[in-house]
Amino acid sequence: LVALLLELAYGKLINKNTYKLNDTISSLFMGSLRGTSGILKIGFSGYVYYQIETHFALWRMDSNLWITWIFAFVAYDFFYYWFHRFSHERQIFWASHVAHHQSEEYNLSTALRQTGTGFFISWIFYIPLFLIGVPSYVMVSVGTLNLIYQFWVHSRHIPKLGWYELFFVTPSNHRVHHAQNDLYIDKNY
């Protein structure tokens, strides 16, 4: 909430407001619903992941090694990419994800505009990480970092970031992802 207020204040300061009250309230409400449904996701997927991790994992990665954390972060992002891509290209996934793209504005509150039904399918994409032995607490940590990273890219106040744009999701290229022009729909994930 502090980040949203800071972005709002900055937008007012430079005379480039990216917030509409009704749109922001809708985004915040949807975000709170997702938070509530997240409890169900943690319970259900946590149980499934635990069973996979303890009974079916091919080996156990050592969480004391930095390479485990780097691997887990990159692999999590890889599977997130495929989940996100499927969320655009498959209708059953799109039915859940479309709410995120319905905001009239593009700001940090848009990042919170998430459906409460996404957890029904998103957890499936991360099963391979548990099968190859990524520890649960490493997954929770890198998943949280990924979520934090996804938040800041929903701002119109951050300019292009040079070479970084070529390799990572940034506010600039994610704005294109949220564009509604036919030319840009489903072009970058």
What is each stretch, according to the model?
Residues 15, 45-54, 86-93:
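Membrane-helix interface/capping segments
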Residues 17-23, 58-65, 99-100:
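Helix-boundary and loop/linker segments of multi-pass membrane transporters
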Residues 5-25:
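Membrane-interface helix-loop junction between the first two transmembrane segments
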Residues 31-41, 64-189:
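Membrane-embedded catalytic scaffold of the fatty acid hydroxylase/desaturase
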Residues 1, 21-38:
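Alpha-helical transmembrane segments in multi-pass membrane proteins
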Residues 1-11, 46, 73-79:
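Central hydrophobic cores of alpha-helical transmembrane segments in multi-pass inner-membrane proteins
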Residues 47-70:
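Juxtamembrane/interfacial segments at transmembrane-helix boundaries in multi-pass membrane proteins
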